[in-house]
Amino acid sequence: MNFLAHLHLAALADSSLLGNLLADFVRGNPQGEYPPEIVAGIMMHRRVDVMTDTLPLVKEARTYFSADYRRVSPITLDVLWDHFLARHWDQLVPNCALPDFLQHAQSQILPHLPHTPARFQSLNAYLWSERWLERYAELPFIADVLQGMANRRPKLAALAGSFYAIEQHYQPLEDLFLTFYPTMMQQAQHKQI
């Protein structure tokens, strides 16, 4: 899962939106560094990552990537899952429009930015102002995101080419997401993540 799904699952579980978004920027044990509710959000994010990576349907999704891109397929899929969530938001979350949800999330996160790592602050400077999470619904934006990640991290250069697998296998990947994500939503609502 990427930013949007982590925020959505956190909201369903009444977990810290800040903690769930911040987690990828925190190494090691966060206790003592952040308030307990943010630590709980960081830990939820980590559980979601482990759970997602071990789902049989996600493992199946990785098989759609050729050997050249299989190493980066978990990252590509995390971004793609956010695309499908944004694209199907109205179907999956009929009681709250995506822009309204994002406005709420932003209001929960921005006041705390001064107390977060500089890299997280930099991300937030673009995430909200450029409407990244809404733009995840646009497939060309997903290609741009993967290209940007590849440009920033040479070891992940294969991310740019991994978009080809998305184009080639879009429908079966979408079907997999629409099968497993509602189950994750239920688990979050029942605090089973």
Curated annotation (Swiss-Prot):
This is Acyl carrier protein phosphodiesterase. Converts holo-ACP to apo-ACP by hydrolytic cleavage of the phosphopantetheine prosthetic group from ACP. The gene is acpH. It catalyses: holo-[ACP] + H2O = apo-[ACP] + (R)-4'-phosphopantetheine + H(+). The keyword Hydrolase applies. GO terms for biological process: fatty acid biosynthetic process. The keyword Cytoplasm does not apply. GO terms for molecular function: [acyl-carrier-protein] phosphodiesterase activity. Belongs to the AcpH family. InterPro entries: ACP_PD, ACP_phosphodiesterase_gpbac. Signal peptide: none annotated. Keywords: Fatty acid biosynthesis, Fatty acid metabolism, Hydrolase, Lipid biosynthesis, Lipid metabolism. Disulfide bonds: none annotated. Its EC number is 3.1.4.14. It comes from Yersinia pseudotuberculosis serotype O:1b (strain IP 31758).
